[in-house]
């Protein structure tokens, strides 16, 4: 195991524990966010350059509110991927919908484990409606594998729903037969 992998696993374990320990208090969240910022700054060269251009680094930041936020256009720059790993190691890539421009942003993952865990934890923590019988007005994740929203609802479907109906068909239209038979 190399140094980068060791750091990555440590950061992931801290985030995973924070997700499981919800609600997290402000001080613990601040400590976690500063740790993630330091990791991202150290391992994500594109983000490090962005922070450097702003005159910021982990030694100057004491509160998570002050962590430099990337503009959404930064995710559209293929030549500067926002990852802490080689892009070729991504097991999942989500794309933005592309509604604002023709260039779609990219968000790469080596694993969606934390992402999936946070979806279920947030759903339960926020006391969102019972999902045991779910109607999804979006494409099934198999039809739209680059959609983070479809992925999120797929996680809800797999982990919380006893019955799921996906109402958008492959052409992007509402499947009226499924809708009528479900209601």
Where are the regions a protein language model picked out?
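N-terminal leader/targeting and accessory segments in enzymes
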Residues: 1-62
């Amino acid at each position: 195991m190399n140094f980068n992998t060791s750091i990555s696993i440590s950061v992931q374990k801290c985030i995973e524990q924070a997700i499981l320990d919800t609600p997290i208090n402000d001080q613990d969240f601040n400590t976690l966010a500063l740790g993630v910022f330091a990791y991202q700054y150290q391992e994500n060269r594109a983000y490090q350059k962005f922070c450097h251009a702003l005159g910021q680094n982990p030694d100057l930041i004491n509160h998570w509110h002050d962590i430099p936020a990337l503009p959404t256009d930064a995710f559209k720059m293929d030549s500067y991927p926002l990852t802490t790993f080689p892009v070729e190691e991504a097991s999942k890539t989500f794309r933005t919908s592309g509604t604002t421009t023709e260039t779609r942003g990219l968000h790469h993952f080596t694993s969606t484990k934390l992402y999936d865990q946070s979806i279920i934890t947030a759903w339960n923590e926020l006391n969102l409606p019972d999902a045991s019988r779910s109607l999804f007005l979006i494409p099934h994740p198999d039809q739209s594998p680059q959609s983070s929203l479809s992925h999120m609802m797929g996680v809800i479907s797999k982990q919380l729903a006893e019955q799921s109906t996906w109402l958008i068909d492959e052409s992007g239209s509402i499947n009226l037969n499924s809708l009528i038979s479900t209601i």
